[in-house]
Structures are given as structure tokens and as C-alpha cells.
């Protein structure tokens, strides 16, 4: 039975050098998928890009193909309502994501092509500063997200935040991770170098 303590064990493996950054993200997203009970789970980091603020996917596991799949940056300019809700509430809870005000922008290019119906994204912080999000997605039919699932994602973020910071900075091609200042949540401080997107051609945030 999946347990949130599995997250601590995965973080410990990274801290002890038993797994590298890529394997850490794979194991973490697989564990999140199991714990939340959804087929897709990912980790996104706040970054600054030439087009403005964005979220960058560092790993996303899809149980339907049993592997990590890629994604392009999710840009605030293209997904304003989503970012506004995420910043204001610390989460986006969209059981009917195709018609939810924060996520309907993703319907044509992302949700419908991938048969996704529900989205649950929860922010996590490092030292009190928003650093990224955990994203869970339900396929096949809508899912009403429970308070237990929302709280579970928050617990995962709390337990994994420092390991996520270390993993984000461990890659030789990655600069210090992007943080939103608590006093000015719209301003980004630094920018990780881009990660190459993989096979997922349909994506959020580019239209």
C-alpha cells in the first residue's frame, strides 16, 4: 500500500547518492501517481523565460505508457487564468478541467487530445518561497478530487521540497532554481536552463 513515507525514502536515496537526479524524479512522480491514485503525475518548477514567467516540467510520469513523458513550458501569457488561480489559492482543483475557468484554456490542445478530464495542481515552497507545483491528471473520465488527495499532495511537497531543490540544482546544465519572492509573487529571480521536451507533442501553455 503506498504511503507518504515512501516519499521520504526516495528523498533519502537522493541525499545518500544512491540515485541520480533523473532516477529521483522518475521514482518521485511514480510514487505520487500511486499515492494520489491518478495515471499522470508531474513536477513543475517556476522559471523566467524570454516570454515571461512560466512553469517548466522537470518530470512527468504517465502510467498508461509506464514511462516519463515530456512537456514544454507552460507560459503565463498563454494561461493567465491558470496562473492567477495558482498564485491566489496555492492550488488548482479542477475536477472538470475542460470547463473549469482556470484550465479550460488547455482543452483543445492538451486535455482532449490526451483524454484528460481532471487536473489537480498544488504549489510547494522552499524556505517559504513558492518553488513549483505537483500536477496530477485523471484520464478517461472526470474525478472529483477529495480533500484527502489535496492534503496528501501538500504533505508530499512539504516532505520533498529540499530534495527537489537539490535535484533542480544538481544538474550541470541547471542554474539556481527560480523563486517567486514572497512579497512580490509575480517577480522571478533566476532561471534554470531549459530541459529538452520529450515525446508529448500535445502540451499546455503554448497557444
Predicted regions and their residues:
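GAF sensory/regulatory domain recognition
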Residues: 30, 43-74, 78
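Regulatory sensory and allosteric helical modules in signal-transduction proteins
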Residues: 65-112, 117
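Short beta-strand-to-loop transition segments that serve as allosteric relay/switch motifs
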Residues: 133-143
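Short hydrophobic/glycine-rich mini-motifs in sensory/regulatory modules
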Residues: 124-134
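Amphipathic alpha-helical regulatory segments at dimerization interfaces
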Residues: 13-17, 26-35, 44-46, 84-85, ...
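Signal-transmission linkers at sensory-effector interfaces
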Residues: 1-27, 34, 148, 166-205
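Amphipathic alpha-helical "output/dimerization" segments
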Residues: 126, 144-165
